[in-house]
């Protein structure tokens, strides 16, 4: 099951990784007082597919006075007034990085991917580090030291060391959560020097559902249910 962004970020937060502050808005709901002090905003449609930016479903707001128009444009593009929206803090970004862990099915192992730039078509870039990770090998204090020399050619030395420590945590998260893919794109290096996961693509193995709380990822489950055809629903039931 692919997770909606809001659920994917909740998973990251549960494992101690920083994500932007955000508020989930359902049909008819507006911004809360909590958002008033944020320095800027993004309004994002919560879907189970990619390509939202190209479809006009992610909008940058300079202030909350732009919220109504942004919501109207997003919902009109979807032709669906019930789509949940994520209102999120705009993080001050100094640099964007790509980091992911996925199952390499051909070799029956995990693969850690890192690139010095985020954005589209990262996996076609020559500047992409690919690091094999044994499925049954949990991270140890030595793991960042194995990642560092592979990525050091792409980043300043101090940043490479910090990023190696950050990336070393992802395979363990993937194992614990039964993930087929955990992609953070972009991972923002903020102007204050912090790492913040600004977007997350997360796919979990459906066959592992029995190991997890059925209440987890409620938005993703609702969206998946809405997307099912009558035949798919009948086959499931």
Locations of regions flagged by a protein language model:
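ATP-dependent carboxylate/acyl-activation modules
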Residues: 1-184, 188-237
């Amino acid at each position: 099951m692919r997770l909606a962004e809001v659920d994917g970020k909740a998973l990251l937060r549960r494992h101690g990784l920083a994500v932007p502050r955000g508020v989930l808005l359902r049909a008819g709901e507006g911004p809360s007082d909590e958002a008033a002090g944020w320095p800027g905003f993004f309004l994002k449609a919560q879907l189970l597919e990619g390509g939202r930016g190209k479809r006009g479903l992610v909008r940058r707001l300079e202030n909350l006075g732009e919220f109504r128009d942004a919501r109207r444009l997003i919902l009109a593009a979807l032709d669906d007034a019930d789509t949940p929206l994520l209102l999120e803090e705009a993080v001050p970004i100094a640099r964007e990085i790509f980091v992911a862990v996925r199952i390499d099915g051909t070799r029956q192992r995990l693969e850690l991917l890192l690139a010095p730039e985020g954005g589209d078509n990262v996996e076609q870039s020559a500047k992409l580090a690919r690091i094999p990770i044994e499925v049954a090998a949990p991270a140890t204090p030595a793991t960042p030291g194995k990642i560092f020399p592979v990525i050091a050619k792409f980043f300043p030395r101090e940043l490479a060391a910090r990023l190696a420590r950050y990336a070393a945590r992802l395979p363990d998260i993937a194992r614990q959560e039964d993930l087929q893919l955990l992609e953070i794109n972009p991972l923002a290096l903020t102007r204050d020097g912090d790492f913040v996961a600004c977007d997350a693509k997360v796919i979990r193995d459906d066959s592992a559902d029995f190991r997890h709380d059925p209440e987890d990822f409620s938005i993703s489950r609702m969206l998946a249910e809405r997307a099912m055809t009558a035949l798919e629903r009948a086959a499931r039931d």
